[in-house]
Amino acid sequence: MKFIDEALIRVEAGDGGNGCVSFRREKFIPKGGPDGGDGGDGGDVYLIADENLNTLIDYRFEKRFAAGRGENGRSAGCTGHRGSDITLRVPVGTRAIDNDTQEVIGDLTKHGMKMLVAKGGYHGLGNTRFKSSVNRAPRQKTNGTPGEKRDLQLELMLLADVGMLGLPNAGKSTFIRAVSAAKPKVADYPFTTLVPSLGVARVGADRSFVVADIPGLIEGAAEGAGLGIRFLKHLERCRVLIHLVDIMPIDESDPAQNISIIESELYQYSEKLADKPQWLVFNKIDTIGEEEARERAEAIVEEIGWEGDYYLISAATGQNVSALTRDIMDFIEANPRVEEEEKAKEEVAFKWDDYHQQAMQNPITEDDWDDLDDDGWTEEDDEGVEFIYKP
């Protein structure tokens, strides 16, 4: 299945149903009074996280999703039926962004998590609501309000504990193959990895972490070179970044310069991401021997001013890989994921009671509404008309 991590869709909540202007007409009750019912509320649009999905491909071609409209009110005090809601299933880790305002509506980070993305319109009032001691035959009603309509940008960000950084051919995919059962493609040419992949690394019987591999970065990625930086968003939720460096590049490039390139591109993309804990890991030490690799690593670390720890491994042979994974596991257990506190729900600008109060002050009169019923009938219209009343 093709990996799609972005989709632009339009969601339309249902409009509220209009109120009804109607009067009770029964045998022996010549002045039955108003009995027009309220309309129904419009349907809402929700997103729900589903752990069985791993791509947004379902929204690549189908772009518009509309909830049901609330039914209009009816006579005999009948309230209109509420519009049907719709729920769109998305992968866990999906972020919803309003495409017009760029407001982040929310993140779906757990299976079954549900989020409202478009609120349905509120119902209109029937003429029964307007009766009073001085207005016994009201011919006023209110219409329902429109439902929200939004263009949503859906972005899938993988949920991983560890993120891999590095130039193309640094050995990131080989490392994931060494520590997990994942089998990303490995070859001796740049950009073998074209889409992100996940692997579960197990350390012992009951300890494990998830590692994410993304396509390699090159100089100028922030300006769109290579595959650009569109996949860096998948590292935003990682707790630690593993910067994998080829200690003896086949193109004879300077490893210290390569490290600086990645750090620069990372900083240009996001300062927050650049400030995450990073571990420097020198790979492919089997090509030159561990002693020479250690000497080269010390020189590189001194040149770039690296103050943290660093590791020497060979992902191809598995040398020192187990020790690295154990240290990663210890770090993850010592730094549990901090759950983002749910934002306090802000007061909605639209308030139900306020709307009804304003609507009753400015109702739609018989000169405004255009319902095709006899609710605007007057006594003058009774002349020459026979009424048939139901018992």
Curated annotation (Swiss-Prot):
**Which residues make up the binding site for Mg(2+)?**
173, 193
Q: Which InterPro entries match?
A: G_OBG, GTP-bd, GTP-bd_Obg/CgtA, GTP1-OBG_CS, GTP1_OBG_dom, GTP1_OBG_dom_sf, OBG_GTPase, P-loop_NTPase
Residues given in the record as GTP binding sites = 166-173, 191-195, 213-216, 283-286, 314-316
Q: What cofactor requirement does the entry state?
A: Mg(2+)
User: Origin organism of this chain?
Assistant: Glaesserella parasuis serovar 5 (strain SH0165) (Haemophilus parasuis)
One GO term describing the cellular component: cytoplasm
Keywords, A to Z, come to:
Cytoplasm, GTP-binding, Hydrolase, Magnesium, Metal-binding, Nucleotide-binding
Under Enzyme Commission nomenclature, its number is: 3.6.5.-
As recorded in UniProt, coiled-coil segments are none
Subunit relationships: Monomer.
* Cited HAMAP family: GTPase_Obg
> Know the name of this protein?
GTPase Obg
| Magnesium listed as a keyword | yes
* The encoding gene: obg
By sequence similarity, the record places it as follows: Belongs to the TRAFAC class OBG-HflX-like GTPase superfamily. OBG GTPase family.
Could you tell me which Pfam families the record lists for this protein?
A: GTP1_OBG, MMR_HSR1
User: Which residue numbers delimit the OBG-type G domain?
Assistant: 160-333
**Where is the sequence biased in composition, kind Acidic residues?**
365-385
Q: Which is one GO molecular function term here? A: GTP binding
- NCBIfam families this protein is in? Obg_CgtA, PRK12297.1, PRK12299.1
Q: Which residue range or ranges hold the Obg domain?
A: 1-159
